[in-house]
Amino acid sequence: MLTFEEAARRGADRVGAEVVRLAAQDVRGMVVPPEFEDAFYRSVNLPEQLGRLFAPINPRRVDEDALEDLTARAEALIRTSFLMDDAVQIFYRALGNAGLTFADRGGGAVHVRRPGHLSSEEAQVTPPGMAALQAVKRLWASDWAFGAVLVRLDETGGVGLDARPTLVLPGLTGTPDPVMAEALGMGTAWVNETGLVGLP
């Protein structure tokens, strides 16, 4: 896991253009790499469990009632599966290194989201950062929501997806700010009570 500043040194092709743009504006944040999410899935055998769960679904003729039940079970499976202790400690250290445990203030808000997407999960964090980790898992679980799975079935004929980066940013979910976007020469900018938090 890397701070935005560290991640930007690796280049947009490795960490995404939004992270590089945020780092250039000195936005504090952290990138949870796709490898971390992938390791979580594999460590608790989620690909096989999810494959068995969705086996009854025919992508050419989706029973939406059955799919709705299965997606609720899949979301619960992600939320209730545990990360390995080493992974948890790595996350906590990285969160602290990024200044997102707010140890100097006794706590603070963060939101987690995917690059380029406004929808997020929020948490009130105190050291070591358990609430932030739970928000990350809720975001990962949202990939298995009914609408998200239905879109994947329509577009790809399957329910699977690749791991993607997750961003952890200070404050609550941002909102579009056209004035900030214009000042930065961007089409869109998101801000919250801490300042700039998104340049998709």
Q: Residue ranges of each PLM-predicted region?
A:
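Conserved short secondary-structure elements within globular domains
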Residues: P170
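ATP-dependent carboxylate/acyl-activation modules
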Residues: A148-V149, L153-G157, L161, T173-P200
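N-terminal beta-alpha lobe that positions the nucleotide/phosphoryl donor
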Residues: M1-L167, T175-P176
